[in-house]
Regions:
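Conserved N-terminal beta1-alpha1 strand-loop-helix module at the mouth
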Residues: 1-86, 147
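Alpha/beta catalytic cores of nucleotide-metabolism and tRNA/nucleoside-modifying enzymes
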Residues: 2-23, 179-183, 192-217
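Hydrophobic faces of well-ordered beta-strands that scaffold small-molecule active sites
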Residues: 6-15, 38-42, 59-66, 90-94, ...
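Generic structural signal for hydrophobic
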Residues: 28-32, 84, 116, 120, ...
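Helix C-cap/helix->beta junction micro-motif
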Residues: 35, 57, 122-123, 151, ...
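Active-site-adjacent beta->alpha loops and helix N-cap segments on the catalytic face
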Residues: 42-59, 72-78, 99-119, 135-141, ...
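Conserved mixed alpha/beta catalytic, RNA-binding, or beta-rich assembly cores of soluble enzyme
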Residues: 62, 76-80, 85, 91, ...
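Glycine-rich phosphate-binding active-site loops on the catalytic face of alpha/beta enzymes
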Residues: 67, 87-101, 150-165, 189-191, ...
Length: 217
């Protein structure tokens, strides 16, 4: 079997390391530009630096909100969305309060997703709804996914940090043969071309990874 090529413009390079330095963030952006990736995913505090570094590139700048817990208040999430928009972000990946969803409080989840979509559309930001699917029942994961489709969110991320087998299980729970306007994202710790190919065959559009891109020049 021949070598599987990576489609770099469908990869999001992330650095959500709490101890990442400005040097690490600069390296992230430089490598992403060199590989012509889809976007970079970073904490809100790094948005001004990344906005400057990515100014003349085609990459999108994506800021993560309420990672990993999702339990910030809705008001604080919207405030951060407004702030990163001013700083130069093109998109946000927002972790919803999936603990509430786990408890069966679907109204809280639906209302939050609707409010997040309204806030991002007002700011003309792309929105990825994110959660930690490994602690949710399939019916809860599907509910969040369908609610995201209903409000016209741009993408859905079922986990950040899950193992490959966990990710595949989550994708199986929500993916369908029907064409949907929302992009399905999946996390991979290492950028393994065969794993990416498998996820793509399952309906995944975008790979989110904190792996070393320089290994795939």
């Amino acid at each position: 079997m021949g070598k599987v090529a990576l489609n770099f413009n469908r990869i999001v390079s992330a650095n959500l390391n709490l101890f990442a330095s400005n040097t690490d963030i600069c390296s992230l952006c430089e490598t992403a530009i060199a590989h012509d990736l889809s976007s970079v995913l970073i904490f809100p505090t790094s948005v001004p630096l990344c906005a400057n570094l990515l100014e003349h590139s085609n990459l999108k700048l994506d800021a993560v909100i309420a990672y990993p817990h999702g339990r910030s208040t809705l008001e604080s999430k919207i405030a951060e969305i407004n702030q990163v928009a001013k700083f130069g972000a093109d998109a946000v990946t927002v972790f919803i309060n999936y603990s509430a969803l786990r408890s069966g409080e679907k109204n809280i989840t639906a209302n939050e997703i609707f409010a997040l979509a309204t806030a991002t559309q007002k700011r003309q930001l792309q929105l990825t709804i994110a959660l930690e699917g490994s602690i949710l029942e399939p019916k809860h994961l599907k509910f969040a996914y369908n609610a995201s489709i209903e409000v016209k969110a741009d993408a859905f991320l079922s986990s950040y940090g899950a193992s490959f087998s966990e990710t595949c299980n989550q994708i199986n729970q929500i993916s369908s043969n029907e064409n949907t306007p929302i992009k399905l994202q999946a996390y991979l710790r290492k950028l393994n071309p065969k794993m990416i190919q498998k996820l793509n065959s399952m309906g995944v559009d975008i790979i989110v990874s904190d792996g070393d891109l320089n290994k795939f020049k």
